[in-house]
């Protein structure tokens, strides 16, 4: 495997970790959860210096968004270098922003699926991961849960 491609994969994984941190902040997941506590203790020192000029606005951590876009940009650069493709700065930044939205939508979709399956399999579980998925999807599902019962369908 090409080392540049492997570095691209690692920067994408870091971007995913920062995206989870962004969602934890936005949905105000409980700090008592061990997964959230670990992510805050490891990633907050990276975001704190950038909060001087990129504050948290409306629950959105702009410093974390900066890190995600920067990591995606580095990943696109490493990937294009590994495949010997032309690298365009404007296209890489725009694709980084688009991939941020795609990544957040993927995380929300999979957490919705995990929350639905978890409510069927283990409705009274105290699993920290299921708790995170439930807390992320709860604001999204609240309008549908106000509907009347549909005879066994779980919204």
Go through each PLM region and give its residues.
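Selective transmembrane helix interface/packing segments
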Residues: 1-155
């Amino acid at each position: 495997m090409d080392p540049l491609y492997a570095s691209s994969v690692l920067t994408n994984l870091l971007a995913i970790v920062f995206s989870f941190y962004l969602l934890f902040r936005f949905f105000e997941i409980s700090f008592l959860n061990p997964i959230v506590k670990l992510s805050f203790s490891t990633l907050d020192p990276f975001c704190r210096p950038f909060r001087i000029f990129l504050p948290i606005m409306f629950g959105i951590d702009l410093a974390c968004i900066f890190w995600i876009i920067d990591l995606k940009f580095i990943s696109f650069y490493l990937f294009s270098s590994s495949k010997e493709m032309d690298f365009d700065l404007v296209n890489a930044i725009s694709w980084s922003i688009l991939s941020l939205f795609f990544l957040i939508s993927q995380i929300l979709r999979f957490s919705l699926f995990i929350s639905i399956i978890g409510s069927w399999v283990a409705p009274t579980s105290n699993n920290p991961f299921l708790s995170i998925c439930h807390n992320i999807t709860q604001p999204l599902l609240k309008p549908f849960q106000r509907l009347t019962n549909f005879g066994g369908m779980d919204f």
